[in-house]
Amino acid sequence: SNNRLYPFWGDLEEGLKTGKPQNATKNGGSPLFEAIYADETKLREFLHAMGGIQTGNFMMLANVFDFSNYNTLCDIGGSGGNLSIHVAKNNPHMTCKSFDLPPVTPIANENITALGLSDRVTAISGDFFENDFPKADVITMGNILHDWGTKDKLMLITKAYNALPKGGALIVIENIIDDDRRHNAFGL
């Protein structure tokens, strides 16, 4: 991603003066996610990076959240399946689904199979804007909502609510900057 993002900093002054985005679309290039998903190597690198950034959060969730009253989980925008994998490894009674776009599903299934969890974790294809969410006792969204405006956030949260049973749980994982920037490594 450095190769793609670094050149945009050259237009920082223009961005500050105009308030307009200084990204690839400015000069007729593809939007970020479109460019990533068009190249399997870039997609694998992106999924690996996103999984690495969130591993600590996913491990903490799997160990700290009380899953004892739940049996199923669906991770919306599940990427390489990491959240579902961590929850399944730490909660043997849980079955998990990792829900993401079709190009991601085979990569997630490779990760799941490599860890011997394909009996309890599956990757399923779908588009969280176009499709209803799969039903589950717990719906998770890791680093999803921050990418979208209020209207889309409300739509995604409504879809999650509709996929949950009474007593279900929606868990949103986002990196929030600590105003003091002393107690949050991501905020530094």
Model region roles, listed by residue range:
Residues 1-71:
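Conserved Class I S-adenosyl-L-methionine-dependent methyltransferase catalytic core
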